[in-house]
Amino acid sequence: MSERTALNRRALLAATGMAAAAALAGCSDGAPGDGDGAAEPTDTPTDDPTETPPTEPNGSLPEGSPSSPTERLRELVAGNAGFALDLHDRLVADEDADNVFVSPYSVSMALAMTYAGAAGSAEAAMRETLGFSLGEETHPAFAELQGELDDRATTDAGPGGGSGDDEDDEIDAFRLDVANALWGDAGYPFAADYLDLVDEHYGGGFNEADFATDHEAERERINEWVADATDQRIEELIPENGLSSSTVLVLTNAIYFMAGWEQEFDPDDTADATFTALDGTGSTVPMMSQNLRTDYADLPGAQAIELPYVGGEVSMVLVVPDEGEFESVEAQLSGPTLFGVFEALGDASGDLRMPRFEYEFDAELSEALEDLGMAAAFGPGADFSNMVETGGGPGIDDVFHEAFVSVDEEGTEAAAATAVDMIESAPAESFDLTLDRPFLFCIRDRPTDAVLFFGRVVDAGSAQG
């Protein structure tokens, strides 16, 4: 284990870095011109990994849209959950799929910035595939959701209001950082209205790039921005040769999450145990253990449990299928059924044993997105005319996604005490749950039900960092 990984294991309960990038290549009718009419780019990269600033919700809604911002937010979250499970199903369909971990929120936000420039069949394909049923209202809805998430995020204090100056405050902190940026080729005729929309609703600053002359140097610059935005967890989102001289625009989203459990695991209770992988092989893993009171559900063919993070507004929900039922339960999960799991959770107390795990996942998502229905948005014939002053605009070439997750015992005493104070009613039921077999998990924002991350662990032995 590297020195950095060891340090973070001591310092964090859960650290998650996630990034997505959509690279667009120019086509003949949208090639760079002499710069006339093009939006004026900035020369300074927006490389501070700060939270995306919220914008005020748009007060007027088009005909057929939800009647209030709250309904608009609900519709966005529901569409994103449906896309999350569709994407997960497509990724695990690959023969070599093992442990998978993605951020549907990150992928959706990067593609939403791209969607803002789409027209015609490309716009229709993206709207259907990504669950953007709000149409143009998708953009203020994302700003509204990000404003909600900004309310959860603190970077300088734990639940006890610490100063952030000592190690304990760092451990106790809840941190949720989201950053967006656009990297556009100098002289390409990007429409000012498009850049203004992305900046207003996503905080995506425009950075001038020179892909034609030195795309490799620009790749390294973008990767450095992503690394900074994910606390160095994602260091090479765009692989070598991932960009080319025909690249005209790269849209990036990075999300970094760190938090402690409200109810911590005692490291002294962690012991080696056997985890049986999906293929039936066994491996020895460090199994954490605690007796706790939390929300739990006994479902047909599975059990589910919720573990809140510091503050109680963001949590991890784990779905543990019965032995031999993993593939069946996984195949049945959809946006509505996942929300059904959330609704089924209720107050309970009992014993929980779950493995420590840490792993990385990366994927080039173009093929998966095309298979899900987005083919019209890829290639030189795609219609992104709303992105440029003249011509058809660039088409999507690649969508890169990389993720890191680390979960262990660390938490805070103050958070655990707060959790006890919040519980007043008697337990509805009891449980005894051991995650010694494949399981699914997500990290969700409880007030909005937004699914920030979704993954599966089918081989805990290979997920030990």
Predicted regions and their residues:
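Extended hydrophobic
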Residues: 251, 306-312, 317, 422-465
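Internal alpha/beta scaffold segment
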Residues: 314, 321-345
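N-terminal secretory signal peptides and thylakoid transit peptides that target proteins
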Residues: 2-19
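Non-catalytic, conformational "gating/processing" segments within enzyme and secreted inhibitor domains
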Residues: 150-314, 347-424
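N-terminal low-complexity, Pro/Thr/Ser-rich intrinsically disordered segments
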Residues: 40-78
